[in-house]
């Protein structure tokens, strides 16, 4: 019964949160980029803060309630469900702390444009990876589905012109590490490493695999 309760909550979070929040995260980032290209950073930061507060925060708060309720079941978790719980905690931290800091920073009267840009980009990057991780575990643990990994079937799906978000969604795994504009995805077995270099527009310009 306890595991069924946890799985029910996991389904709620996945079905109600994963797709909407991922789409919103990507859309909000694009809105911010659009603002920066059409207005000065100070005006763009203020408008982005207003958009985040108005469009994003209410949805985040709903998901936080669902995630927080999972904390009550911590003592009943074991094995794979423990992984799901820890992943949910990471997502909770990203939403509650990191986005809270971002909103406070953006809403401030005085902001440093460079710091805001860096904070915004890193927050969305970490948020996307944490949601991806949770959804991947959900598919494996709750649905009993296999998950994509770096292999001969998934590698051909990665093409030039794709963004980081598109590649990680196709592989259903975040990158292992990045060095500047070059990102690395390594298979769990360690026998494949996908190396992708992105251009200034954020699209893959070079893709190759090390075996």
Segments (PLM) and residue ranges:
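Second-shell loop/turn segments in exported
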Residues: 42-54, 81, 151-158, 195
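Intrinsically disordered, low-complexity segments enriched in small/polar residues
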Residues: 16, 30, 54, 75, ...
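A cross-family detector of function-defining hotspots
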Residues: 144-150, 156-211
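Extracytoplasmic/secreted envelope proteins and their assembly/folding machinery
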Residues: 22, 29, 50, 60-64, ...
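C-terminal amphipathic alpha-helix
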Residues: 2-53, 90-146
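Short, solvent-exposed, charged loop/turn and helix-capping segments
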Residues: 53-89
């Amino acid at each position: 019964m306890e595991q069924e309760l946890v799985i029910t909550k996991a389904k709620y979070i996945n079905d109600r949160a994963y797709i909407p929040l991922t789409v919103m995260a990507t859309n909000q980032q694009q809105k911010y980029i659009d603002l920066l290209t059409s207005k000065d950073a100070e005006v763009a930061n203020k408008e982005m803060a207003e958009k985040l507060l108005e469009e994003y925060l209410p949805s985040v708060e709903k998901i936080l309630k669902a995630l927080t309720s999972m904390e009550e079941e911590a003592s009943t978790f074991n094995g794979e469900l423990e992984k799901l719980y820890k992943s949910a905690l990471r997502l909770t931290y990203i939403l509650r702390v990191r986005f809270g800091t971002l909103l406070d920073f953006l809403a401030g009267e005085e902001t440093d444009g460079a710091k805001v840009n860096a904070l915004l980009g890193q927050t969305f990057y970490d948020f996307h990876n944490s949601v991806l991780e949770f959804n991947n575990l959900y598919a494996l643990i709750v649905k009993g589905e296999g998950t994509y990994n770096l292999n001969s079937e998934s590698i051909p799906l990665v093409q030039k012109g794709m963004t980081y978000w598109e590649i990680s969604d196709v592989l259903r795994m975040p990158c292992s590490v990045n060095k500047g504009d070059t990102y690395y995805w390594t298979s769990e077995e360690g026998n494949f490493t996908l190396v992708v270099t992105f251009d200034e527009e954020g699209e893959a310009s070079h893709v190759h695999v090390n075996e």
